[in-house]
Amino acid sequence: KDIADIQWAVGSDIDYVALSFVRCATDIEEVRRLVQRASVSSGKRCVVKLIAKIESARGLANVDEIIREADGIMVARGDMGVEMPIETVPIAQKSIIRKGYLAAKPVITATQMLESMIENPLPTRAEASDVANACFDSTSAVMLSGETAMGKYPVQVVRTMRSIIDAVEKQFDYVDFHHDIPPEVKTGDIPAIMSYNAVSVAYLCNAKALIVLTETGHAARLLSRLRPRMPIYAFLSDERLFNQLALNWGVRPFLHSGTGTRLDVVVDEAIAICKRSKLLAEGDKVVIIAGLPLSQQGSTNMIRVETIQ
């Protein structure tokens, strides 16, 4: 059945597949091979990304290799609380979130976040604190399950979670977070250095936004892990990647025409899209991150500051 489900996911252009009870990197490698075979047999590009659910003691013990191999991580606290002592779950959650963002991989915190709202129109204070603390830990996303799948107040629970997230993000110390320098910056990785310095420049010039031109989404993910105060507008020409980037913290993806090969042409198109969307106005400063030549993957090597005309 798992093979049939993977074949269906590939054939249906599903963006992410979540794997339950991942024990080690080999589990992910095996599913990735199945995805590749299904892509070949269906004549589609192999673009499905894999999210590893950490919900067992063995998975937690091997979390570093799992994060390296997966495209994203889910902290599945329900089964985790059954598989290991309950008092270790909050500690594991914080550790996984930190490891995930340092690896520039999105982390989803899930299970029983607003559980009481299955039956009640308001959450408990403890549940509100649970959602807030996951956000303060810098999780990429928080996920509802039974609350919206079978609860009495599915719309209200989403609004409640949204309001908690908004309140936290108004209090989040983004500048202090930026001082937590990623390890690749210290070891000389050029794209990591460029992303870190782009955010530094954005703070120094009080930029309204970061605009990143990306072919693979990697540059946008590197910016996302730095949790900048200003939004990240990612411009790309691949529709599947456009959908997948929506999971990354602070990233708002946009599709551009993909016809421009000169930097100025693509930047002008990106700025025009932002102005039409009323995201940028005359006088706003933006920091632009790109790689030259534009069509070359993994070449992030340019930072530019522009004032919107």
Feature map (PLM): residue ranges:
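Non-catalytic helical/linker scaffolds that mediate oligomerization, partner binding
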Residues: 1-309
